[in-house]
């Protein structure tokens, strides 16, 4: 243990470190089989009962096999009596029916796979029915006659208070067959009853087969007992004794189909001094657990990690046998009641099982036992927490440096978070020969010099759960130094340390006598104060004078402008843009056209008419702007009818509308329009997007422009309607186990909010979503981007939120508010102050504000990652100021859960740092088309095409990319495989729309910046982008 601690401590000083256990790697340890349930390994059963041996294992990627043994000998299929023993290899269970004496002993199972094996033993003990009446509390008059006869003919006088001499062959004759079945061992002889037999004449036993089920006799009689008399059955009729039987217990002799122990109860005992008495076979009583009070008897709390099986027991007694009803949070549970994720509740006879429990299964459960006499309840408080398969986490800021005086007490606190049971110790790091570490020749590594604090007499260590406290009493200068808290479990170890500083006693000089009187105000102080007051007065007078002059000039200028005129009309003119000599765009506008605002004066009469029209309609402040009409795309306003709003942003709205193309043809469309609070800049942006739609043309995977409403009145841009909303929300709707992220109205930005499905438009989900569907989505987007690239259009904002899902799940690329036409240059340089989505931006765009088609390829790789994670948020654990530095150092996102190897290769090739090494959209379309058309066997066998595609883009130097390391470990996954998300999702959903971050993130390397309120991490402006330093050394790369 000490050597292992020293090896772990040798990693580093004054920082949290982790150390993995030596021996099995985590890869092997996680794949060793483990049992799913905690099984009962000892069974005490009666003859004729049934047993189920459970060796089921938890879900794993590695197939496991089970073998069954009887007394350490393998049970082969040809040696098994199939009528008695049945194997269930799928559920890894063994069913043993019709228990007889020969089944008593050891049964075991062994589960194994390629990584290891586990075993479980079961002990079976057959309890004789008559052994129950050996308890001294049961009066001898209540013992069934068949048991007395069995003990007599088996020559086992097990009860000394029974008069065996009074038991005759006539009384025992009707129990002959039952006596054989009840025997723990075969009787040495079969009793012979009748006049022709002697009293104890016997016939040798020749053969004993497997005992069958005891005969069920429906005739149940009453018994009349006399004081101190033997048991003699008295019949109500003259029926043959063999046709009736005496029953003293309420024993259910039918086969128990449940996996729980059967209840047996006896009638009320008869006192020895009782007279002639009639006994009832059973007595009605209400359900109860430990008492007969119909009140809440139990209130249990069950807390366990996710993935375990939760079992709530509600074993109740009573007659008639109670019926159990389960409730969760006050609602009755049925077999049709659904759990989170599509799982079902498992109802046993006396218990409720919740397999693979998740956090959503937490809540208040209670069971109610009912019969016709009464009821009883039992309550359970269930808490399910997520598992953490990792070494312990030492909570930061708990263990802090201490500074105390000599002879005082120093106290250090350490708190650990761990799913597994952690082990915590305290050590002191010693400095020997000027160094805290030394080189261990046998281990060939540096280790710390340390001493465990348990060996110190004046140190006390106290553990309470996951918290530990180190207390050092009567500290001295020798105790000054570094103390560390070490915590470990089966997955590794973590360390945190703090420094203890001991203060010596210092001499304090105290002044005595009266304090001298000193004049605090000197002549220079008076002069300085006077000058300051004069300057403040002068500044105040100057400010008042400035405001008065400004108001006067403003009023004069307004009067001059309104002489004969009251307003100006502004026309939005779109014309061809003249090219500069350097053939480079000079601002943010697209190159083929330019948008200008031309003002023309209007008369008072025309201005008054416009003012009345504005007040009586939906026109906004922008009503004085008129956009030149385009006859090719113009749509009459009278043919549009707005239905309801689909989405909105800070200055824009998207409405669902109906467009009447002809008298008899009416279609549903989407209309983009500006809000009343919009300004001139937003109008120009909407006009720019409209012109981009006109330049692009039509393609199946690009949102189609239907027309626009220009001229006098608000500007409407009419596009086709995609009823399933955007791709991000469509994919998140297929997530079965998590809440969909909702966006509050306070998080709206200047961008138009992506359309989200409302109650009026239900998303048509794909019933069985497979990897082929996801690759099909990626192929459609690549086709649309290939079309835009052929048109020399740079999208600049390619993301899942800007891809819409139409009829038949056809994807449409939309939102061209940031798109630019680069017919002349093949690139575009950003010079304005617009906002940009940095999570989807390429390195060259973050570094130099340069955008090319290859920049869209980078964004396509991020969108592909969103598709494979069903709408996950990229870089959820990296703060935005650190993103650029991490990307420059070679970091790329890890492969999504169960992502095919070929798809992740494609992502990594899109994230190449050099532009020329990224594939074109034409190459991406061909590659995805190859994946969709080839069969699974062909994909695995056609590595030549796959290797050639990626080898052409491999770099000659630099760190190993995630693609190369992933290629060595990942296996091919067929596209027909279902998309199985883990019970606890690996890819977080964070809100993608945030405002500009104005607060620097806290200096905490362990903090996960996912939807952090202190860090707005989606969109930045060029001013705030300067906070991303270009020097890689100044940024700390987080650990992954």
From Swiss-Prot:
Transmembrane segments: 526-549
EC number: 2.7.10.1
The protein's required cofactors: Mg(2+)
Catalytic activity from the UniProt record: L-tyrosyl-[protein] + ATP = O-phospho-L-tyrosyl-[protein] + ADP + H(+)
Biased segments, Basic and acidic residues type: 234-257
GO molecular function: ATP binding; metal ion binding; protein kinase activity; transmembrane receptor protein tyrosine kinase activity
Alphabetical keyword list: ATP-binding, Developmental protein, Disulfide bond, Glycoprotein, Immunoglobulin domain, Kinase, Magnesium, Membrane, Metal-binding, Nucleotide-binding, Phosphoprotein, Receptor, Repeat, Signal, Transferase, Transmembrane, Transmembrane helix, Tyrosine-protein kinase
Phenotype upon gene inactivation: Early arrest in larval development. Impaired guided migration of sex myoblasts. RNAi-mediated knockdown causes ectopic membrane extension from body wall muscles.
PTM comment, free text: Activity is regulated by the phosphatase clr-1, however it is not known whether clr-1 acts directly on egl-15.
Regions of this protein lying in the Cytoplasmic compartment: 550-1040
Region annotation Disordered: where it falls in the sequence: 234-267, 952-984, 1021-1040
Ranges in the topological domain labelled Extracellular: 20-525
GO cellular component: plasma membrane; receptor complex
Disulfide bonds, paired cysteine numbers: 55-109, 314-367, 414-485
Cellular compartment(s): Membrane
The Protein kinase domain, residue ranges: 640-931
Membrane topology, record value: Single-pass type I membrane protein
Family: Belongs to the protein kinase superfamily. Tyr protein kinase family. Fibroblast growth factor receptor subfamily.
Known function: Receptor tyrosine kinase required for larval development. May phosphorylate adapter protein soc-1 which in turn may result in the recruitment and/or activation of phosphatase ptp-2. May activate the Ras/MAPK kinase signaling pathway which includes sem-5, sos-1, let-60/Ras, lin-45/Raf, mek-2 and mpk-1. Acts in the hypodermis to regulate axon growth and fluid homeostasis. Activates protein degradation in muscles. Probably following interaction with ligand let-756, negatively regulates membrane protrusion from body wall muscles during larval development.
Protein name: Myoblast growth factor receptor egl-15
Organism encoding this protein: Caenorhabditis elegans
Source species taxonomy: Eukaryota, Metazoa, Ecdysozoa, Nematoda, Chromadorea
Recorded name of the encoding gene: egl-15
């Amino acid at each position: 243990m000490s050597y292992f601690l020293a090896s772990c401590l040798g990693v580093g000083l004054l920082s949290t470190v982790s150390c993995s256990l030596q021996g099995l790697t985590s890869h092997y340890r996680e794949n060793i089989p483990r049992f799913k349930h905690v099984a009962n390994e000892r069974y005490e059963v009666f003859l004729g009962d049934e047993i189920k041996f459970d060796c089921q294992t938890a879900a794993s990627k590695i197939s496991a096999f089970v073998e069954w043994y009887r007394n350490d000998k393998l049970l082969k299929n040809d040696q098994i009596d199939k009528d008695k023993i049945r194997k269930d290899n799928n559920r890894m269970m063994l069913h043993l029916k019709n228990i007889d004496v020969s089944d008593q002993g050891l049964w075991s199972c062994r589960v194994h796979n390629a990584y290891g094996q586990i075993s479980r033993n079961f002990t079976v003990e057959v309890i004789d029915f008559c052994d129950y009446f050996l308890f001294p509390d049961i009066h001898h008059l209540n013992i069934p006659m068949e048991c007395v006869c069995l003990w007599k003919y088996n020559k086992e006088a097990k009860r000394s208070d029974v008069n065996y001499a009074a038991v005759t062959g006539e009384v025992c004759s009707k129990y002959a067959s039952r006596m054989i079945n009840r025997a723990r061992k075969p009787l040495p002889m079969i009793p012979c009853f009748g006049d022709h037999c002697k009293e104890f004449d016997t016939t040798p036993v020749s053969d004993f087969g497997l005992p069958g089920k005891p005969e069920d006799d429906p005739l149940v009689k009453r018994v009349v007992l006399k004081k101190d008399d033997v048991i003699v059955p008295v019949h109500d009729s003259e029926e043959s004794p063999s046709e009736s039987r005496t029953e003293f217990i309420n024993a259910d002799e039918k086969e128990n189909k449940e996996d729980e122990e059967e209840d047996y109860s006896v009638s009320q005992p008869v006192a020895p001094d009782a007279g002639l008495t009639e006994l009832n076979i059973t007595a009605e009583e209400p359900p109860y657990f430990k008492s007969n009070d119909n009140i809440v008897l139990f209130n249990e709390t069950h807390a366990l990690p996710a993935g375990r099986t939760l079992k709530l027991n509600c074993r109740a007694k009573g007659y008639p046998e109670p019926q159990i009803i389960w409730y969760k949070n006050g609602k009755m549970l049925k077999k049709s009641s659904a759990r989170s994720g599509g799982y079902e509740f498992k109802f046993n006879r006396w218990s409720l099982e919740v397999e693979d429990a998740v956090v959503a299964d937490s809540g208040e459960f209670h069971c109610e036992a009912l019969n016709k006499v009464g009821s009883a309840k039992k309550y359970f408080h269930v808490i399910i927490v997520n598992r953490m398969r990792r070494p312990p986490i030492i909570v930061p800021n708990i263990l802090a440096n201490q500074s105390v005086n000599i002879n005082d007490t120093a106290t250090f606190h350490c708190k650990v978070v761990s799913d597994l049971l952690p082990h915590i110790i305290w050590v002191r790091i010693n400095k020997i020969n000027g160094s805290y570490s030394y080189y261990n020749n046998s281990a060939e590594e540096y280790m710390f010099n340390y001493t465990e604090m348990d060996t110190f007499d004046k140190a006390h260590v106290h553990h309470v759960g996951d918290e530990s406290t180190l207390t050092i009493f009567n500290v001295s200068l020798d105790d000054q130094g570094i103390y560390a808290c070490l915590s470990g479990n089966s997955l590794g170890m973590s360390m945190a340390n703090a420094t203890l500083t001991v203060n010596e006693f210092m001499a304090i000089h105290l002044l005595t006598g009266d304090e001298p009187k000193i004049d605090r105000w000197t002549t220079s102080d008076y002069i300085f104060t006077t000058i300051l007051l004069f300057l403040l007065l002068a500044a105040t007078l100057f400010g008042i004078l400035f405001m008065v002059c400004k108001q006067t000039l403003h009023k004069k200028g307004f009067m001059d402008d309104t002489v004969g005129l009251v307003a100006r009309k502004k026309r939005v003119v779109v014309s061809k843009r003249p090219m500069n000599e350097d053939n480079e765009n000079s601002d943010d506008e697209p190159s083929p056209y330019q948008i200008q605002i031309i003002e023309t004066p209007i008369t008072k009469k025309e201005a008054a008419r416009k003012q009345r029209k504005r007040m009586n309609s939906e026109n906004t402040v922008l009503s004085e702007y008129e956009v030149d009409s385009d006859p090719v795309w113009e749509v009459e306003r009278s043919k549009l009818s707005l239905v309801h709003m689909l989405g909105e942003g800070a200055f824009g709205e998207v409405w669902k509308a109906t467009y009447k193309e002809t008298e008899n043809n009416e279609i549903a469309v989407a209309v983009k329009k500006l809000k009343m609070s919009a300004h001139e800049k937003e109008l120009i942006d909407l006009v720019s997007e409209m012109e981009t739609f006109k330049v692009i043309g039509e393609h199946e995977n690009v949102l189609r422009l239907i027309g626009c409403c220009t001229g006098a009145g608000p500007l409407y841009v009419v596009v086709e309607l995609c009823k399933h909303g955007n791709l991000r929300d469509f994919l998140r709707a297929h997530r079965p186990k998590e809440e969909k992220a909702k966006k509050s109205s306070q998080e709206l930005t200047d961008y138009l909010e992506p359309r989200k499905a409302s109650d009026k438009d239900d998303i048509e989900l794909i019933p069985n979503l497979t990897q082929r569907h996801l690759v099909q989505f990626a192929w459609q987007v690549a086709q649309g981007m290939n079309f835009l690239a052929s048109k020399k259009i740079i999208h600049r904002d390619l993301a899942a939120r800007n891809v819409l899902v139409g009829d038949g799940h056809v994807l449409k690329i939309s939102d061209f508010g940031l798109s630019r036409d680069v017919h002349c240059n093949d690139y575009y340089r950003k010079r304005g102050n617009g906002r940009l989505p940095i999570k989807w931006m390429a390195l060259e765009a973050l570094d130099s504000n340069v955008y090319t088609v290859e920049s869209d390829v980078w964004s396509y790789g991020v969108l592909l990652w969103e598709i494979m994670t069903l709408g996950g948020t990229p870089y959820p654990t990296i703060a935005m100021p650190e993103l650029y530095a991490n990307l420059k150092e070679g970091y790329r996102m890890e492969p999504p859960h169960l992502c095919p190897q070929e798809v992740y290769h494609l992502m990594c090739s899109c994230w190449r740092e050099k532009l020329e090494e990224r594939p074109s959209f034409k190459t991406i379309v061909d590659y995805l088309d190859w994946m969709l058309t080839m069969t699974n066997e062909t994909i695995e066998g056609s590595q030549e095409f796959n290797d050639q595609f990626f080898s052409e883009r491999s770099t000659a130097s630099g760190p190993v990319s995630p693609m190369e390391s992933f290629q060595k470990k990942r296996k091919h996954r067929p596209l027909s495989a279902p998309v199985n998300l883990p019970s606890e999702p690996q890819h977080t959903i964070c809100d993608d729309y945030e405002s500009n971050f104005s607060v620097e993130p806290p200096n905490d390397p362990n903090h996960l910046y996912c939807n952090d309120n202190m860090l707005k991490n989606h969109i930045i402006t060029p001013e705030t982008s300067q906070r991303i330093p270009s020097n890689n050394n100044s940024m700390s790369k987080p650990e992954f």
